[in-house]
Amino acid sequence: MGCFESKPDQQVQPVTVRSPTDIFWLVLYVVFWIALIVIAVFSFIYGNPLRIINGYDSFGNTCGVRSNDKFSNFPLSGMNTEDKPYLFFLDIKELRHTLKICVKECPQRELLNAAELYRYYEDRKTKLCRYDFNMSMLQTQEANQGAKYFDFNGPCPPFPVYQSAPVLHRCIPTGVNAPLQQVKKMYALINSWEATQQVFSDLYKAWPTIVLICALSLVFSIVMIALLHWLATIVSWLICIIVVVASVGITGVLWWSYYKAKHTLDTDQQLSYLEELVRNEATIYVLAIAATCIMIILLVVIYYLREKLTGLAALFEEAGKCMLQLPGLAGPPLLAFLALSVFLAFWVVVVVCLATANYPGVKPLLPLAQLEDSASIANDPKLKPELAGKNDTSFKSFKLVEYHDVNVLRHMLWIYIIGLIWTSEFIFACQQLAIAGAVAFWYFRKPTDSPVLLAIAKLVKYHLGSVAKGSLIITIFKIPRLILTYLYAKLKRHQQEGSECASCCLRCCICSFWLLEKFIRYLNHNAYTVIAIEGVNFCPAAKIAWNALVTNALQVATINGIGDFVLFLGKLAVASICGLISILLLRDNPDLHFYMAPVIIITVFAFFIAHIILSLYEMVVDTLFLCVCEDRTINGNSGRWKESNLARLLGEAPEEDAVEAPMQEVQLTPITKQPFSAQFLQAEMENSKA
């Protein structure tokens, strides 16, 4: 890729006329997105999360839906089931083979014979027989004396019909006479669904809450920016207090939620058969322990950094001064927020459809109705169901629908996971390059036109390829990091059993974490500052930025690191508050299989949004430090850095007068040790206007 080449250091000449950088990587990114769109189209065709959430009957109708697909040769398909949101199994003793229908409500009382079934239909207007069955047939003497209407194949359920309650839109017997073994089998049937389907169907069900809390995270992030700007002298302490309170709050709520979940399972033995509730309890327990550990670590770190927090006032004041003179800096974060919101919404919809992708198939035909060739199943009010004889050619057969998974599309989830990381990093990188370019132009040259618009124009016109390459490199090293995280959890269990091999692998895993973290940190957004100023490719820019920072005082890196840590605490505070709100809103929602899945997604999305907004300050600070490092190295005490508050962080007293210190114009931007000439500056300005 160019980043890994071992060559002697060469002076990188600044370009006088910019040209597009890293074009190949932009083409690769566009091709990747074309593949994502193609996969999305197929997911929309085959995916339907409501089939998992509400269930579907034996004729292919999804319960609780106004419009269902009409299949040829399936007479009872394509029905309007909007008023029938619950799935009812006619015979709970034959769950895998019995007829399933959508009903208005689950049976509210136990029904023992045909007369009670008809009376229930008259009282509750709830039909517990097949859609085409004439319920008046239950009043005949033949219906009360015979069992031919009451079978697992239908048209009506065999007796007794137990009192039931909806569990995840399925009617589960709850009456005192309900057979325990059959109830366990029904819960086992629900538990047999893939966990991935359940998780993504929960995301689909909770999308209004996800959107609401993500919008709140934007508001909280803007409030945090306002605090950084107007309360710079005490904002470090204020953020620490907020994050401590938020971490204590979410830890307390998690432990309280775990207590309630455990108490519910202990008091209602039947609920313990549902794996989703058990999984919720286990997940809350793990998250509560993790939140407790994080809270303790935060308290310890904040305690030991308390003396250094006061010195950050100068850092945030200087960043605030830059933002005050460049109000347009608020533009890139808002654009990035909109782009990320649209992408995350698109991503969630597609992965939900991918996880629920299936296609209709035909179950073994069940001869359920005696029909004339001209008869209509759906509209013949005199229909009298009879079980067909084996050799009777006047009988037609019902074709029952069963959906089968599209395994090829399921595997496409991995491509979308890569797409989530790469596209998110791409959006972050675009924002960072635009901000870095604007701040660098402001620091070195103070152009009369808008530096923000100039930086955005250069990004779109020249540097999208470099952004695509930089975000891909980070993605390549983040994916193994996720894999190693999974291996860490597995190997830790074997290490406790005394496995030397697992212990060795665990050490290698930790070492890999460290190396990957260092490499990703090396490819930080300082490279985008160099790209914005010099117009070079990503890898040379990363090398230049690294050398510029390494050759300067350790104190600069320390203060910069503490400043980034405080901003990270701000992002963590926003994510914690949003996670706390989501737990309170979703934990009592009966329609969710695994409510902790939306909570985790909301927390991650809130952190992403806070990262976009608060990275404005982070990028301004890091860019100013990079500019100050080069300014100090080349211009010494005559550099502009002497007049800023950052001089205190370098152990110097800032200039008291407001007169700008004399500077040599040809040495204003010497990041490559090749100072820009006046002719180059003039050409750059003309190029930006072109």
UniProtKB/Swiss-Prot annotation:
Domain of life from the UniProt record: Eukaryota
Primary subcellular site in the record, as a coarse category: membrane
GO (cellular component) term, any one: membrane
One function term, GO molecular function aspect: transmembrane transporter activity
UniProt keyword Transit peptide present: no
Leader sequence residues: none
Localisation per UniProt entry: Membrane
UniProt keyword annotation of Hydrolase present: no
Membrane topology, from the record: Multi-pass membrane protein
Glycan-linked positions: N134, N391
Alphabetical GO biological process terms: transmembrane transport
Record family assignment: Belongs to the CTL (choline transporter-like) family.
PANTHER family given in the database record: CHOLINE TRANSPORTER-LIKE (SLC FAMILY 44), CHOLINE TRANSPORTER-LIKE PROTEIN
The protein's name in its UniProt record: Choline transporter-like 1
Organism: Anopheles gambiae (African malaria mosquito)
